[in-house]
UniProtKB/Swiss-Prot annotation:
Membrane topology, record value: Single-pass type II membrane protein
Catalytic activity as recorded in UniProt: a beta-D-galactosyl-(1->4)-N-acetyl-beta-D-glucosaminyl derivative + GDP-beta-L-fucose = an alpha-L-Fuc-(1->2)-beta-D-Gal-(1->4)-beta-D-GlcNAc derivative + GDP + H(+); a ganglioside GA1 + GDP-beta-L-fucose = a ganglioside Fuc-GA1 + GDP + H(+); a beta-D-Gal-(1->3)-beta-D-GlcNAc-(1->3)-beta-D-Gal-(1->4)-beta-D-Glc-(1<->1')-Cer(d18:1(4E)) + GDP-beta-L-fucose = alpha-L-fucosyl-(1->2)- beta-D-galactosyl-(1->3)-N-acetyl-beta-D-glucosaminyl-(1->3)-beta-D-galactosyl-(1->4)-beta-D-glucosyl-(1<->1')-N-acylsphing-4-enine + GDP + H(+); a neolactoside nLc4Cer(d18:1(4E)) + GDP-beta-L-fucose = a neolactoside IV(2)-alpha-Fuc-nLc4Cer(d18:1(4E)) + GDP + H(+)
Superkingdom of the source species: Eukaryota
GO cellular component: Golgi cisterna membrane
UniProt record similarity statement: Belongs to the glycosyltransferase 11 family.
GO molecular function annotations of the record: alpha-(1,2)-fucosyltransferase activity; galactoside 2-alpha-L-fucosyltransferase activity
Glycosylated sites: N65, N301, N327
GO biological process, one term: positive regulation of endothelial cell migration
Protein's recorded name: Galactoside alpha-(1,2)-fucosyltransferase 1
Intrachain disulfide bonds: none
Catalytic activity, EC: 2.4.1.69, 2.4.1.344
Membrane-spanning residues: 9-28
Other facts: There are two genes (Fut1 and Fut2) which encode galactoside 2-L-fucosyltransferase. They are expressed in a tissue-specific manner.
Length: 365
C-alpha cells in the first residue's frame, strides 16, 4: 500500500491553500464590486460620510441649487460612468451633456463629479446624481479620451466602470436629446427672473417702446487673444464681423436690440458701433461668476457668437437664429485635427467668414 511521504503531504497542503485563496479572492472581488454599486446608490450606508447625496428619490426635498427631479432614463446595465470635469463653464456644460447622452445610449448610469456639481448646480436644475468620493477613489475605472464629434464606436462601449475625459461639446453627441438637454440646463428661477428684469428695462431709442426682439451677443476675448494666433493660427471675432452679424439681424427683424456680454467689455465698448442706439453693454465680464451673463444671453431670442463653448451653449439654449464666426483658422492649423466645424455648429446656423488677413500678414509670403 502506497503511503504519501511528508513531501507529498506538504505539496497537497500548499495546493489546497492556493485554491482556497483563489476562491476567497473571487468572493471578495464580487463583494467589493457589489459594495461599490451599493455605495454609489446609498452613500449613507455606513460606508461613506459624504455630504453629497448621489441617488435621487422621488419626493425628496432638495436644495434650491440642486436637482429637482430624478433622472428620467434609469440605466439598464450595472456599473457607473462619469466624466472628468475640466475647463470652465462652457466646457463643463459640454462634458455634462455628452456624459448624459453616451451613458443613456449605452444603458449605463451616469454620475457627475462633485467639482462639476459645484460649477453647474448653482445655475441649472441638473438631475444627474453626484459620485461619492469614496467610489471615485476605489472604483476600477477605465479611462476614455473623447474627441469632439460622435463616432460609431461610442455607441458600443462595454466598460461598466468608465471615466470619460476630454472637452466634448459637439451637438452630434446629444442633439437627439435636445429637449432633455434644454431641461437639464434650465436656469434657476432667481437667475431667469433677474435676467428678464434687466431686459425689461430696455427701451427702443426712437419710440420708447419695449423691444420685441433681443439678440444676445457673446464676444470671447481673454486668453483667446494669445492662444488663437500663437497656438492655433486663428483669430477671434473683430469689430467688422460683429457689424456684419448685427446688420444681418437688422435686415430681418424690426428694431432688434443687441445685448452684449464679453470677458472683454472694454474692447466691446470701443469697437462696437452704437450710433443706432440699439446696442446695450449689459455684461459684467466676470469669468469666475458667469451665471448672470449667461442668463442674459439665454433669455434673448437670437444669438451672435464669436468662438468658444460659452457662446455655443448660449445659442443652443436660446434657440432662434444664430450667427457664428466661420473659418477662423488658417487651413494649415492643427486645430482642425481636433475641431470639425460641421460637428460644432448646427446646420441651420449661419456662418460669417472671419478676416484672416492679420494671420496671413504674419505668416508672410
Amino acid at each position: 500500500m502506497w503511503v504519501p511521504s511528508r513531501r507529498h503531504l506538504c505539496l497537497t497542503f500548499l495546493l489546497v491553500c492556493v485554491l482556497a485563496a483563489i476562491f476567497f479572492l473571487n468572493v471578495y472581488q464580487d463583494l467589493f464590486y457589489s459594495g461599490l454599486d451599493l455605495l454609489a446608490l446609498c452613500p449613507d450606508h455606513n460606508v461613506v460620510s459624504s455630504p453629497v447625496a448621489i441617488f435621487c428619490l422621488a419626493g425628496t426635498p432638495v436644495h434650491p441649487n440642486a436637482s429637482d427631479s430624478c433622472p428620467k432614463h434609469p440605466a439598464s446595465l450595472s456599473g457607473t460612468w462619469t466624466i472628468y470635469p475640466d475647463g470652465r463653464f462652457g466646457n463643463q456644460m459640454g462634458q455634462y451633456a455628452t456624459l448624459l447622452a453616451l451613458a443613456q445610449l449605452n444603458g449605463r448610469q451616469a454620475f457627475i463629479q462633485p467639482a462639476m456639481h459645484a460649477v453647474l448646480a448653482p445655475v441649472f436644475r441638473i438631475t444627474l446624481p453626484v459620485l461619492a468620493p469614496e467610489v471615485d477613489r476605489h472604483a476600477p475605472w477605465r479611462e476614455l479620451e473623447l474627441h469632439d464629434w460622435m463616432s460609431e464606436d461610442y455607441a458600443h462601449l462595454k466598460e461598466p466602470w468608465l471615466k470619460l475625459t476630454g472637452f466634448p461639446c459637439s451637438w452630434t453627441f446629444f442633439h437627439h436629446l435636445r429637449e432633455q438637454i434644454r431641461s437639464e440646463f434650465t436656469l434657476h428661477d432667481h437667475l431667469r427672473q433677474e435676467a428678464q428684469g434687466v431686459l425689461s428695462q430696455f427701451r427702443l431709442p426712437r419710440t420708447g417702446d419695449r423691444p420685441s426682439t433681443f439678440v444676445g451677443v457673446h464676444v470671447r476675448r481673454g486668453d483667446y487673444l494669445r492662444v488663437m494666433p500663437k497656438r492655433w493660427k486663428g483669430v477671434v471675432g473683430d469689430g467688422a464681423y460683429l457689424q456684419q452679424a448685427m446688420d444681418w439681424f437688422r435686415a430681418r427683424y424690426e428694431a432688434p436690440v443687441f445685448v452684449v456680454t464679453s470677458n472683454g467689455m472694454e474692447w466691446c465698448r470701443k469697437n462696437i458701433d452704437t450710433s443706432r442706439g440699439d446696442v446695450i453693454f449689459a455684461g459684467d465680464g466676470r469669468e469666475a461668476a458667469p451665471a448672470r451673463d449667461f442668463a442674459l444671453l439665454v433669455q434673448c431670442n437670437h444669438t451672435i457668437m464669436t468662438i468658444g463653448t460659452f457662446g455655443f451653449w448660449a445659442a443652443y439654449l436660446a434657440g432662434g437664429d444664430t450667427i457664428y464666426l466661420a473659418n477662423f483658422t488658417l487651413p494649415t492649423s492643427s486645430f482642425l485635427k481636433i475641431f470639425k466645424p460641421e460637428a460644432a455648429f448646427l446646420p441651420e446656423w449661419v456662418g460669417i467668414n472671419a478676416d484672416l488677413s492679420p494671420l496671413q500678414m504674419l505668416a508672410g509670403p
